[in-house]
Amino acid sequence: MEVDYFSYVVLTRALLPHFIARKAGHFVITSSVMGKIGTPMRSAYAAAKHALHGFFDCLRAEVAADNIKVTILTPGYIRTNISLYALTNNAYGLGKPSENIENGLPTDRAAKQILKAIKKGSFEPYIGRFSGERIALWLTRLAPGVFTRIAPKLIPK
């Protein structure tokens, strides 16, 4: 929560008075698909990302009259080396690439999607490939009970 949520809140509170004084600004927040859905083994991370969505959805409405925009990037799997260093429940790095991340969107394509979304002023763009995570986002919006029944089956054996 300290990094994935509170750091955004502290920085936003520092910048907001300047944006309001200028009557312009654009907050671009990097969240995650986990900010919209919950999957097994990711409860703390998902909680922080859900908190980001709630905070910045509210802020968007509060500052719209001051010409301040809020974009919440919602990336899926992006091909990076993050899983090599991601902490496991025993505080050691995973030390190996995640198959999902290895098959994720290359970083250069992710950057292009991000820049396009910022230029368009998108509220909450999905960044990534058309894949299971995008389908999960649709399911949680259109038929939340379906994903709730599928989620327990995602626990690694």
What residue spans do the PLM features occupy?
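A short helix-coil junction within the Rossmann-fold of NAD(P)-dependent oxidoreductases
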Residues: A14-K23
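Residue(s) in the substrate-gating loop at a strand-loop-helix junction
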Residues: S32
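Alpha-helical segment proximal to the catalytic Tyr-Lys
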Residues: P17, A61-A64
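A transmembrane-helix-recognition feature enriched in membrane-embedded lipid enzymes
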Residues: S122-K157
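SDR active-site lid
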Residues: A65-S131
